[in-house]
Amino acid sequence: ITACLVLIGTVCAKEGYLVNKSTGCKYNCLILGENKNCDMECKAKNQGGSYGYCYKLACWCEGLPESTPTYPIPGKTCRTK
């Protein structure tokens, strides 16, 4: 049973670019690959991810719950001030 739960958790985990819900923009990063800031942001309590790194100058997260939005947010374009 435990193995099945682990497998289901892995299959159902979401991944994608972390997005700022207010602006609709990706979280930017400069240090590609392993990135402490991206990892910290992805693992934050309000995000719920298991791992994060910098990919194509934006934070990519793995192991996100389905409830965490990823870029792009449908119907919302990236707007900065």
Swiss-Prot record:
Belongs to the long (4 C-C) scorpion toxin superfamily. Sodium channel inhibitor family. Beta subfamily. Residues 14-79 form the LCN-type CS-alpha/beta domain. Pfam families: Toxin_3. One of its GO terms (biological process) is defense response. The lineage of its organism: Eukaryota, Metazoa, Ecdysozoa, Arthropoda, Chelicerata. Beta toxins bind voltage-independently at site-4 of sodium channels (Nav) and shift the voltage of activation toward more negative potentials thereby affecting sodium channel activation and promoting spontaneous and repetitive firing. Is toxic on insects and crustaceans, but not on mammals. One of its GO terms (molecular function) is toxin activity. Expressed by the venom gland. Residues 1-13 form the signal peptide. Keywords: Disulfide bond, Ion channel impairing toxin, Neurotoxin, Secreted, Signal, Toxin, Voltage-gated sodium channel impairing toxin. InterPro entries: LCN-type_CS_alpha_beta_dom, Scorpion_toxin-like, Scorpion_toxin-like_sf, Scorpion_toxinL, Scorpion_toxinL/defensin. GO terms for cellular component: extracellular region. It is found in: Secreted. Residues 81 form a propeptide. This is Insect-toxin Cn10. Has the structural arrangement of an alpha-helix connected to antiparallel beta-sheets by disulfide bonds (CS-alpha/beta). The keyword Transferase does not apply.
